[in-house]
Amino acid sequence: MIVSFRPTADLVDSIGVDVRSCDLQFRQFGGCSEFAGPISTVRCFQDNALLKSVLSQTSAGGVLVVDGAGSLHTALVGDVIAELAHSNGWAGLIVNGAVRDAAALRGIDIGIKALGTNPRKSTKIGTGERHVEVNLGGVTFVPGEVVYSDDDGIVVV
């Protein structure tokens, strides 16, 4: 499902006090600063094999929300995984953790938000969970709901 982008500030103004706006401050890394789409989720800790497996599947503009437990010890996404996501039709990634290859990520036409960077690779064992509710910054990200992200923040509707 392709979702038309709407600025998060406009969504907040139209929804009002019931808005689900993420309080966690993410940094922009991808080449696309505005993105929106249906939510898919992964929960993994310092292991990106499951994340890569999910992004290997085609998506019609989905956004993968990755709960990496806020770890900045290893990167969950780098240029290879970001290119894979872009080539398979994903609109964006929201990573509660670290990324790497920051300069290269800016050149990939996909939205990527993360907490920070670390050049250290993650493990590739495949541990984690998929299709689970993920709680970040006071917001519950539910698979199938729609997330909007831009320079002002992240809103779930």
Swiss-Prot record:
Family: Belongs to the class II aldolase/RraA-like family.
Enzyme kind, highest EC tier: lyase
InterPro entries: RraA, RraA/RraA-like, RraA/RraA-like_sf
Binding positions for substrate per the UniProt entry: 78-81, 100
Pfam families from the UniProt entry: RraA-like
Entry EC no(s): 4.1.3.17, 4.1.1.112
Keyword annotations from UniProtKB, A to Z: Lyase, Metal-binding
Superkingdom of source: Bacteria
Protein name in UniProt: Putative 4-hydroxy-4-methyl-2-oxoglutarate aldolase
